């Protein structure tokens, strides 16, 4: 696997060409704050989701009168990116439309994924360019899996606390699609105590109201200050018993149960005019 390593005096990050996916996020003492990718549970670490978030009905999307096979979270995470820029503290990987991508998604695009270090923070930015001559619908998101418990937080309870103090409604998946019936918020005054039992029914989705930032970690130990830009939807996910929690800011969600397979009809779909550019990012700062 081709890896690019970036580092500063505080952090080291490894990024793979496959999916432009972060593979490790380590502090100077060698502790990795990112999930290890243990195949017993889940081999992912920090996939980039494009051009779709979540599932489509029967894993099929339609664009106009044409139908295309599209697996969960799109194809970017399984695609080989090209390294186009590398410096000590940042790197950029690129994926461009090709005959292979147009067989699944009939649009011309460029997707640049940058990883950049600033002190004890890593900033990941996806820049999407519509290189075609028609409006391009898409979904995009991030899926970073952080260690649970965090290094140095073993034996301590962990929580997620929203910066906005909100209590967003919870939505659940049914067969990989969003059940449109809202449930009571599991947050109390912006705080959710993490419990593996809460994920026995798959991910916890918060399409609206989660704001733009949170703190994940233990109350008196290590934590991560996590924020995002231009991504209105949010989800939490793990596999019960696994040592990670995914903090997932999205633009777009899975299709709804009973909903259309049309890409432009999916909830929270984004649209780029010909020649336009969209930017999306998250920032994770390690504390403690």
Describe each region flagged by the PLM.
Residues 12-67:
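Acidic-aromatic substrate-binding/catalytic surfaces of carbohydrate-active enzymes
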Residues 45-51, 257-265:
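Short, structured beta-strand/loop micro-motifs enriched in basic residues and often containing a Trp
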Residues 61-65, 270-287:
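Short Pro-Gly-centered flexible turn/kink motifs
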Residues 66-119:
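Extended, loop-rich substrate-binding clefts of extracytoplasmic carbohydrate-active enzymes
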Residues 97-146, 151:
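Acidic, contiguous internal or C-terminal segments within carbohydrate-active enzymes
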Residues 112-114, 267-272:
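Beta-strand-rich interaction surfaces with strong enrichment in secreted/lumenal proteins
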Residues 145-229:
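Active-site/ligand-binding surface loops and adjacent short beta/alpha elements
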Residues 218-258:
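Glycine-rich active-site loops that engage anionic ligands at enzyme catalytic sites
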